[in-house]
Amino acid sequence: MLDEGRTLSLNVFLNALEEGYRNERRYCFILGAGASKTSGIPTGEELARQWYGDILERYSREEIKALKKRLGVRRTQPSSRAYFDLYALRFFPDYQNGSAFLERTLERAQPSLGYYPLASLLANTRNNLVITTNFDSLVEDALFIYTDKKPIVISHELLAQYINFNTSRPIIAKLHRGLFFDPLNRAEQVSGLSEQWKDILREAFRRYTPVVVG
């Protein structure tokens, strides 16, 4: 349950953001999977449920038990927390099939209405940074559709060094990589931040106040 003493009404939150911006504070936006749902992209929990059904159809109980032991899988009850374990089971042994599945799932998604104000903020204010674990291209698509600003998209940790926080151009930092850059989808890949991201994020949070969306 949310701590009511730490929960803000929408009006209080927006007023605080507006006043902070007038006082030269910069905000960045941290996007999770929930931000993509209204654009037709399944949540992590919805994908986990789909993969769980596929696994039950493909394997016997004994085979699932053996695979869990081989892959070090701990969670198989479908939930957002089991996303990475169920991905590992569903697409073993060829995880390129997992990448192809995600491409098919995400490629037709279009930015929902909520991406319009986000694109406007990124393009027209100093609040120009998005940090996300999502693979999709909804933020950059919204910028192309609604604004004339081309974003700097960091779709791989090896490109993180090219982020320039002094630019007025929108920056999209994809911590788990972009859809076409072998996205990180297994538990051992996301157990911690890569070294390339750590220094960049420290600097980002010195300059920006994070606002979490989805």
Protein language model regions, located:
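Conserved catalytic-core helix/loop/strand module for nucleotide-ribose chemistry
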Residues: 1-209
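Active-site loops and adjacent core secondary-structure elements that bind or stabilize anionic groups
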Residues: 214
